[in-house]
Amino acid sequence: MSFFRGTFSTSSLFINTVDSVTKRFATKKSAGSTKNGRTSQPKNLGLKKSGNQLVYPGEIIIRQRGTEFHPGTFVGMGKDHTIFSKTIGLVSFSKEPKFPGSKKTRRFISVAPLYTNNININTNIDTSIDTNVNNNNSNINI
């Protein structure tokens, strides 16, 4: 038993028991960081004007991602696919086939203008008042 002599002593046994009694461990695990604690800014997508509603030039009709709605007459499309009015008028929605004979349809947004700029007024110029005026009927485009 000389091999085990000195390995066990009363002092070493006493210290080990005291260490095991006095050691403390965390009773609650510390919280880790999360990657989900933020939100993105709202994009405010969707319809801004409905059917038969009055719009003015430059007013946004719909904000969208991709071409869910396609631009029709008197309507423009921005680089982010926002559809806006080009004239004063009423908004209208329609469905048309993608190509003739197709079952798939596309939705279009158009604006029916209230005013047209192509008004022809025919006037007869009286040449008896001034001698320098030619004897012609003139069409004036306003």
Curated annotation (Swiss-Prot):
The keyword Ion transport does not apply. GO terms for biological process: translation. Residues 27-48 are annotated as: Disordered. Its main location: mitochondrion. PROSITE patterns: RIBOSOMAL_L27. Residues 30-43 have a biased composition (Polar residues). InterPro entries: Ribosomal_bL27, Ribosomal_bL27_CS. Keywords: Mitochondrion, Ribonucleoprotein, Ribosomal protein. One of its GO terms (cellular component) is mitochondrial large ribosomal subunit. One of its GO terms (molecular function) is structural constituent of ribosome. It is found in: Mitochondrion. NCBIfam families: L27. Belongs to the bacterial ribosomal protein bL27 family. This is Large ribosomal subunit protein bL27m. It comes from Dictyostelium discoideum. The gene is mrpl27.
